[in-house]
Amino acid sequence: TRKMQVPMDADGYIPRIRFTQEPNKLAIITLNRHQNRLDMYFGDPRSTVCKQVLRDESDAYIKEIVFDNIIFYPENFSYLSEKSGYNHLYWYSMGGNLIKQVTAGNYEVKNFLGWSADDDSFYYVSNEESPLRQAVYKIDRKGKKTKLSAQEGINSAQFSTDMKYYMNRYSNLSTPTVITLNDNTGKVLSTLVTNDALKQTLAKYKVPQKEFFTFQTQDG
């Protein structure tokens, strides 16, 4: 048994420990007690020495979505951060150097789906059309963005390891979850789940139609 030399606060947390693609680099993510400062270290399991590669700070707190969207590649890793005011995707070298901010704008990236080495493209889910909707997007090395999901509502996706295909889960206020198999251009190859039986059951109960609305409070 070896104790890793992680330079963290005495009352801090280690919310995640992740394998990278290098056997001598174990990613150790720490939070301070207030959970508004995140540090990531690469620890050598043999020497137990840990090197800091990333620090992120927030005025409020670091959301759990950040930990689960760090994906390690041979030369890079992904990171979601609200340091611009909105949750966006950043691309780092394995040495901890920021290569680029992948997404930007007045919207939130909800989930990073993966990076394709074939064409240096990033796939993600965001709510850039509306806070009430989520769609699947692709953005290439030049910053050209393509919306892959056609349905309006809540979309999520799970990609194959080669990033050529994905399963899309979609639902909205009147549509139970529909699952389709798509290629990485968004083309639907097969419908796997329709939930037609559930639709028919709900129709029998004549459930009132739900709708969203906005209103203004006294303080604006």
Describe every region a protein language model picked out.
Residues 22-24, 74-75, 118-120, 164:
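Short coil/turn segments that connect the beta-strands within blades of beta-propeller domains
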Residues 73-87, 116-118:
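Loop/turn-rich, solvent-exposed surfaces of beta-rich toroidal or solenoidal domains
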Residues 98, 109-114:
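A structural signal for short, hydrophobic beta-strand segments that form beta-sheets
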Residues 49, 85, 98, 118, ...:
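Cysteine-rich, disulfide-stabilized extracellular repeat modules
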Residues 44-48, 93-97, 140-143, 183-185:
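Short loop/turn segments that connect beta-strands within beta-propeller blades
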Residues 1-8, 13-42, 50-63, 67-68, ...:
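Non-catalytic accessory segments flanking enzyme active sites
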